[in-house]
Amino acid sequence: MKAQDLRQKSVDELNQELLGLLREQFNMRMQASTGQLAQTHTLKQVRRDVARIKTVLTEKAGA
């Protein structure tokens, strides 16, 4: 997910995507703690995607 693509979305779309990613991150954390998560690198990707969305939301709020 690129920040440039995120900037084209509306605030409502970004909030929905953020909520979905946070749920996904929670589920991944639970899987990682029980040893069921095979691809641990996805945790890092989701965390960075959340940060990108939050950054774009902050940019839109300031504009």
Swiss-Prot record:
Xref: PROSITE patterns: RIBOSOMAL_L29
Domain of life: Bacteria
Pfam families on file: Ribosomal_L29
A biological process term (GO) from this entry: translation
Family matches, as InterPro entries: Ribosomal_protein_uL29, Ribosomal_uL29, Ribosomal_uL29_CS, Ribosomal_uL29_sf
Molecular function, one GO term: structural constituent of ribosome
GO CC aspect terms: cytosolic large ribosomal subunit
HAMAP family linked to this entry: Ribosomal_uL29 (MF_00374)
Name of this chain's protein: Large ribosomal subunit protein uL29
Upper classification of the organism: Bacteria, Pseudomonadati, Pseudomonadota, Gammaproteobacteria, Aeromonadales
